[in-house]
Amino acid sequence: MKTHKALAYFLLLQLHGSLLAEQKERSPNIVILMADDLGYNDLSAYGHPKIKTPVLDQLAREGVKLTSFYAGATVCTPSRMALLTGAYPARLGWSKGVIGHIMKKGQGLSPDALTMPEIFKAAGYRTAMFGKWHLGDEPPLRPHQQGFETTFYLNKSNNQTKELWRDDEV
């Protein structure tokens, strides 16, 4: 009887050890937040004395808080392109913002550009995008063709459209 208890205890310890090892091997969750027209000091986590952002403050406390910022552009579309690709927008064919905020047919983030979500997906991550896309209205320029598996987004600025897209359907 003692042998069975000792064996069961030993197996339980082995199982516990393998579960701990599995937890250590898991990749971290990565959440990237991008907001148009948000300055460095606009969140309480970064020192704003009056604006309270408790949820973002908690994310900053429990995650990695970045304190050196570089933007690929000063306006939304090329800045998003720079964030997603790591390339200067001019190298992707964008040197300024979207004229009149409406893209021409076929205009957007090139499907040939390698994106961060494509790299994460290849490394076994699940990818998602929620919010404003404004990097191309039609296939192959939509988020699903740029590496995102799950999406819920506006294709343009909300002053141009109220259509919400979920996983490539209105």
Positions of PLM-derived features:
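Bacterial N-terminal signal peptides
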Residues: A8-S18
